[in-house]
């Protein structure tokens, strides 16, 4: 569970992981019921924040729901090795939803972890720029530490107002299969909990 406090010490958000790992010790946990966003007032202004925890990032729907609920920044506490494919998931969640994704991970001194905390700002193109840019604005190493990244929220908002990803051209009426609860081969698992 993630608990987010604002700079004044007020609890703003409590989020319980929706996608618990049914194939491991997390099978004994109760999954969360929903994804939430909250307006977080910072010294630089307000930003709409949501959260996913670790395995939630494996499901594009997690970030998409948060985007639809207004998230501009998704916080992602993590506890597993951050390798190229997991980093690619985070980059994709930021790109496809035009939002920032900030991940903190346990350092390499913790078993089965390797640090690699990151921030993707979600802005793939800059006005007047030539081609796309790398949205990764922070990639930490394996050591324990406090890592800071500057997120230009106004730039993100301008980008969201002009570009084509996110909710700009979706056709949700054609996505009925996404809410179908049936699971077919080859994806049936004995450990799955609905």
Task: List the predicted regions and their residue ranges.
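CN hydrolase (nitrilase-like) catalytic-core segments centered on the catalytic cysteine
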Residues: 57-147
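C-terminal beta-strand edge segments of enzyme domains
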Residues: 107-194
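Alpha-helix boundary/capping residues
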Residues: 18, 78, 97, 163-166
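Active-site catalytic loop in hydrolytic enzyme cores
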Residues: 1-69, 78, 82-92, 113
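Generic detector of leucine side chains in alpha-helical contexts
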Residues: 2-4, 13, 29, 40, ...
């Amino acid at each position: 569970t993630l608990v987010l406090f604002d700079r004044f010490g007020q609890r703003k958000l409590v989020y319980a992981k929706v996608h618990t790992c049914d194939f491991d010790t997390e099978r004994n946990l109760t999954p969360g019921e929903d994804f939430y966003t909250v307006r977080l007032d910072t010294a630089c202004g307000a930003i709409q924040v949501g959260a996913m925890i670790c395995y939630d990032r494996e499901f594009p729907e997690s970030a998409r729901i948060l985007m639809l609920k207004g998230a501009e920044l998704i916080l992602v506490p993590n506890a597993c090795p951050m390798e190229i494919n997991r980093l690619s998931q985070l980059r994709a969640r930021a790109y496809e939803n035009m939002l920032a994704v900030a991940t903190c991970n346990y350092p390499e001194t913790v078993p089965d972890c390797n640090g690699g905390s990151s921030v993707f700002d979600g802005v793939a193109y800059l006005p007047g720029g030539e081609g796309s840019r790398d949205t990764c604005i922070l990639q930490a190493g394996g050591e324990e530490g406090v890592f800071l990244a500057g997120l230009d929220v106004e730039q993100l908002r301008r980008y969201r107002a002009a570009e084509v990803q996110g909710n700009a051209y979706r056709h949700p009426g054609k996505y009925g299969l996404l809410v179908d609860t049936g699971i077919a081969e080859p994806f049936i698992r004995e450990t799955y909990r609905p």
